[in-house]
Amino acid sequence: MYYYLITLAVIALDQLTKWFVVQNMEIGQKIEVIPGFLYWTSYRNDGAAWSILEGHMWFFYLITVIVIGIIIYIMQKYAKGKRLFSISLAFILGGAIGNFIDRVLHQEVVDFVQTVWGNYYFPIFNVADASLSVGVVLMLVYVFVDDRKTKGIK
């Protein structure tokens, strides 16, 4: 059940960083953290990742509740004893709940992490988004490793 602690840590870090941004930055304000690469940029998003489906909050409520339920079910039924699988689900669950809290309480999500590579500005994101991405990457690694084990490949 350690994976629920990971989920709680992700939610706490996500909500704490968003609270800090809301309390200390104006929307649109940018603070350079690593020159030419990393900025804290206060932004509000009422859509999904990269502002997809902006303004369709009812859709996100429904989908998120379903996804959270499915993840908890899978964690309870299948994740025990599968460390990488359970950790990946914990990161996904923490990210989903972190952004869901924002949508329910504020009808928008606080984003603030902005990275720049040369002339490319990656879409602004938050800890929950990063957690979702880490969870998905870990899940892909788990599936690849598990598939190799199943087939007996070293």
From Swiss-Prot:
Keywords assigned by UniProt, alphabetized: Aspartyl protease, Cell membrane, Hydrolase, Membrane, Protease, Transmembrane, Transmembrane helix
Active-site residue list: D111, D129
UniProt KW Cell membrane keyword: yes
Gene Ontology biological-process annotations: proteolysis
Organism superkingdom: Bacteria
Enzyme class: hydrolase
Gene Ontology cellular-component annotations: plasma membrane
Described function: This protein specifically catalyzes the removal of signal peptides from prolipoproteins.
UniProt record similarity statement: Belongs to the peptidase A8 family.
Protein name, UniProt field: Lipoprotein signal peptidase
Organism of this sequence: Listeria welshimeri serovar 6b (strain ATCC 35897 / DSM 20650 / CCUG 15529 / CIP 8149 / NCTC 11857 / SLCC 5334 / V8)
Annotated gene: lspA
